């Protein structure tokens, strides 16, 4: 008779967030070694990764806030560029400049107090910066205002507004 010793399952002492951090890095390395490219071309995986690093709760809905910090909903932006920057793309054009400004302040950028910008090097976060909405609006509103007339007139190939927050602006305001 062969006695089989029943193994007790090991307790996993890692939180789901810690497990995600570990698996995220392993998946990236595997894809890199196989020449498969960046497995996270859509920003959602980076949002989940950033939330784990920052101790935030990821939003389970794909619309609205990316995550929630101690002050409420927050916005995440990430880049793999050599210099940190953030882009706000696909901003809907409103009927008047007053409506456009109100939309940005109340419904889009100003809706979330904290905006977090991360720069990735491979699977690692090289830097994360936090800007508050009033500072982001100080940067973004003049850029939107400059694009607004052409976008509003319908003479642009892409009718939506897109603006970039530069490295210099992030460093100055963050």
Regions found by a protein language model. Name each.
Residues 1-174:
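Nucleic-acid endonuclease domains
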